Amino acid sequence: MFRVQKELVSHEAVIVALFEEDKKSSFVQELDKAFEGQLQVLLEEKELSTKKKAISKVHSLGKTNVKRYYFVGLGKKESYTTETLRAALGKAFKALQAAKVQDAAILLDSFVTDKLDAIDVAHIAAEVQGLGTYELQTYKADKKDRVELEKFTAITAEDAQEIEAALTVGYVHGRATNSARTLVNMPPNVLTATKLAEYAVELAEKYDMDYKVLEKEEMEELGMGALLAVNQGSTEPPKMIALIYKGKEEWKDVIGFVGKGITYDTGGYSLKPREGMVGMKGDMGGAAAVLGAMEIIGELRPEQNVIAVIPSTDNVVSGTAFKPDDVITSMSGKTIEVLNTDAEGRLALADGITYAKKLGANYLVDVATLTGGVIVALGNHTTGAMTNNEELFEQVLEASMETDEPIWQLPIFERDKERVKNSKFADLNNSPGREGHAVMAGTFIGEFAEETPWVHLDIAGTSETSGAHDLGPSGATGAMVRTLATLVERFGEE
């Protein structure tokens, strides 16, 4: 699909950057020679816009071998960021898709500044080509034919091998994020814990990873009472899924990802209202993020050791379902008083984290659509984070900045720990109250990480979006897939 060339040949469409400073630049003047000065006229008439994210389509009318030029407005160079570039290219690729373009090119060097080099631009362009043109996988009888971009050429004076490598990495990041999106968008009668486990096994086998899928009997033997409690009301069997990637000869410095895999959450006996229940098929967004990251890791083969653990079940109501006031025993041996059956994700993660440690994880990152409280605190564009280790958090933060998936650290104070330990009957309670809800959930999970360096990522606000945006349609976003993978790729770098 991807090619690198030094000069333009014949293409259906070409993407070109247009900064505020480019109105009279030598670059525009050179391109304008073929248009006999018409580009300058369009700029002066403001029909060719340099405004951020503005997409201006110009037909060559046979003046060049390119049928259409798509000029991408990027504003002033001083305010140019990777986020600006991602959003603008997202709109550009949507425009190409709407025009059913199959052969396109990008004048890569037109996007290069002292802030972003050609490798950065190539990575982002290939990544966004997948993200921006993703479409919801529907179950409608009448399916529309989709025209795919079949050829994409980067025009640049830079080293072709380096640019090809950046295009490949970006493409893998985008494709894996879309894989996660598709998982989250699947209906719960299709994506059960069993089906999620089957997907994970196929992924592991494709990339020659080791894997384990624990069945209910094995979980009982290991004392995974927290996950099993959540599963009590269901006719669907639970699964504890583990993928093991060995990127080093020696099994050390193991990064452990733990993704919440609740395939549907009714709230249990602490039942959600109707309007709060619709959409709970997405409560396995953390599992999808982890699996998406493992897809990238499998493709790119970084020299790191990684474990991905997914505790999976649905949370439903029946005569056998767990109840408020129950006391359960987790795999760690810690007992938990259940005050809210709708705070089930942290119970599943408790056993998931303990199991990841058992498998040898030296560093932990859990990802979960955990609390409505984090949405109240941070909105729908920022993921909440908590940690017991600032050094590990800084690495996660740097990865999130590189991928433009912003995170914000929430605190853990001793008084928060005291609140989750406030129980007359057990070591912990799973829901101390609504105040500081996101912090309480993260603090609870931290009790199972114990001394192992750990970062908690609450993606309840960022996992899905209610409307179309520059990088995709409404629905799942694939939040944290690229951040987790980038963390592994950069782990330990100074």
UniProtKB/Swiss-Prot annotation:
Key word Transcription regulation present: no
Superkingdom classification of source: Bacteria
Segments crossing the lipid bilayer: none
Pfam families: Peptidase_M17, Peptidase_M17_N
Subcellular location: Cytoplasm
Any GO CC annotation of this UniProt entry: cytoplasm
Active site (catalytic residues): K272, R346
Record-listed Mn(2+) 2 binding positions: K260, D265, D283, E344
Official protein name in the record: Probable cytosol aminopeptidase
